[in-house]
Amino acid sequence: MSMSCKINWLMVLVIIALSNLESSLGRLVFEGSAGLMNGFTTLTNTKKHAYGQAFNDEPFPFKNSVNGNMTSFSFTFFFAIVPEHIDKGSHGIAFVISPTRGIPGASADQYLGIFNDTNDGNSSNHIIAVELDIHKDDEFGDIDDNHVGININGMRSIVSAPAGYYDQNGQFKNLSLISGNLLRVTILYSQEEKQLNVTLSPAEEANVPKWPLLSLNKDLSPYLSKNMYIGFTASTGSVGAIHYMWMWYVFTFIIVPKLDFDIPTFPPYPKAESQVKLIVLVTFLTLALFVALAASALIVFFYKRHKKLLEVLEEWEVECGPHRFSYKELFNATNGFKQLLGEGGFGPVFKGTLSGSNAKIAVKRVSHDSSQGMRELLAEISTIGRLRHPNLVRLLGYCRYKEELYLVYDFLPNGSLDKYLYGTSDQKQLSWSQRFKIIKDVASALSYLHHGWIHVVIHRDIKPANVLIDDKMNASLGDFGLAKVYDQGYDPQTSRVAGTFGYMAPEIMRTGRPTMGTDVYAFGMFMLEVSCDRKLFEPRAESEEAILTNWAINCWENGDIVEAATERIRQDNDKGQLELVLKLGVLCSHEAEEVRPDMATVVKILNGVSELPDNLLDIVRSEKLENWYERYSKVIDPVTTEESIGNLAITEPILPSGRPRLFL
């Protein structure tokens, strides 16, 4: 039984709430730079290369006093970091579980007031910490200068992720740890699941995010004693920062109750006297020069206004495949970018009509990493622009204007598939034949990306929202505007997990490495969702029906997998087709990557060229993970490709290890 299911019946045992630390100082013991500043509890002040500690004066029971078993628990605390410089932090803050009240011999700077250079990494430390790190230390393998990590006995994080949270729609939102805003951290540990989850979110978010930022599957009982002290540490280096602690809550159960409070505003970092004088001087000089510069500014303004729409085509852009549109063309086509269709995975999407041809287009304004050069970015887009398949949304061209990038696609009038699945009651319901056709269209597109091109293309985000429907109810797979090409033999690793929860294969969370198998997993979930007419997760449904994959397998084991679909779908379908799609969906979404078929095999099964094995349920249940489709390949033709890509024909056998990989 999952942690989310158990939450519904867990009983409240104990609540220890230190609400508003500044009024509960008697329960805290301060060390180092920790104390009071501006009426708030702080772990550091303006002193450089210093650390502060604040620990509860009484230990917290982590193990049952009768049988010594580890107990489940949750912690919630609120903090804010106000840096000396708005764009540069110091070192960071950490939540700590320690065998002692306070940590003797701790060092500042990169050690966060927890460890030092001699005891870092010692198994005898028995310290568990959640770090909110604002400085990238290569010696500890830090991923960046704005991340959250789980550490055991040392400063090298076991798992870490860039600071952010998943909103109620499952979209990832970045957060800055040095924004000066109040942030909430929730730490939940289930002893039965042996799982530690960490979430980070803005304080104004009413609810804790449904999906954790970090998840560590590990039994913590060997690292914790019966009674341990809980507290916080922080440190500064050559750059100063004030680390504020505001509220914290401890629960011996894994429910996190809704908290109601007024969000405080923290004062800015105190400026040195020399800085104040400098600000006054700069202000005076600015005002003195303003009049003299005004005339020049007006001249420059009118000159730039005249040349506003002038765009220069650089020599290297001639090599790019897609057509380059002028900014003026797109500005006029979209009526000044006022016809907003929605927000895509990388930015807003606008509807437009090209003058002359009256062709309908969709224009996506791409938000991209500023560290990535425009030349490199356009090279990647030119690669995507050469994809040609009837079930892929076609990239018509691009526009580069003022360091912004606009991608131009065919406009599909019926919008995305999710509107048909979960739209209003007035929305036309899809028939079974339409659903089956959509599933086959998406399968064909994905098979082309995996097997039909000169590169292996990994989509990474298969879901109904990324499937668009044309006026004839044909489906096209979209939202693959940004990509990176990796040479043969390169083992891709990513510090940011891409995709949508529910459609992400289990191995993605462990390795962060997308593969064709992770795409197949997402497609399996997609098949179940479309064919059953149910969401992947129904929290209000009966417990056995709450998770769609589990419900489908239960129905299958009970003799009729078709019962997993809604009554409307069961009454309007070819039962044989529905049974085939459901079984194939369960197989594709198997937790073990080795069990899943490839997309070429999936297409053959959907088209009736090949059949599923008779003992498929045994394969799904089997703990011995083998490539069933390799054994089954005696009745399946070898995968070869003969696809037309513009004027290029590919007739050689396609092998995943023999081509570069393209990650979308």
From Swiss-Prot:
Keyword Cell wall biogenesis/degradation: no
Keyword line: ATP-binding, Cell membrane, Glycoprotein, Kinase, Lectin, Membrane, Nucleotide-binding, Receptor, Serine/threonine-protein kinase, Signal, Transferase, Transmembrane, Transmembrane helix
PROSITE patterns in UniProt: PROTEIN_KINASE_DOM, PROTEIN_KINASE_ST
GO CC list: plasma membrane
Cytoplasmic side: 300-664
Extracellular side, ranges: 27-278
Transmembrane stretches, start-end: 279-299
Domain Protein kinase span(s) in chain numbering: 335-617
Annotated glycosylation sites: N69, N116, N122, N174, N197
Active site: D461
Membrane association type: Single-pass type I membrane protein
Principal location: membrane
Catalysed reaction, written as an equation: L-seryl-[protein] + ATP = O-phospho-L-seryl-[protein] + ADP + H(+); L-threonyl-[protein] + ATP = O-phospho-L-threonyl-[protein] + ADP + H(+)
EC number(s) stated in the UniProt entry for this protein: 2.7.11.1
Signal peptide start-end: 1-26
Cellular compartments annotated: Cell membrane
InterPro entries per record: ConA-like_dom_sf, Kinase-like_dom_sf, L-type_Lectin-RKs, Legume_lectin_dom, Prot_kinase_dom, Ser/Thr_kinase_AS
GO molecular function, one term: carbohydrate binding
Annotated family: In the C-terminal section; belongs to the protein kinase superfamily. Ser/Thr protein kinase family.
Descriptive protein name: Probable L-type lectin-domain containing receptor kinase V.3
Species assigned in the record: Arabidopsis thaliana (Mouse-ear cress)
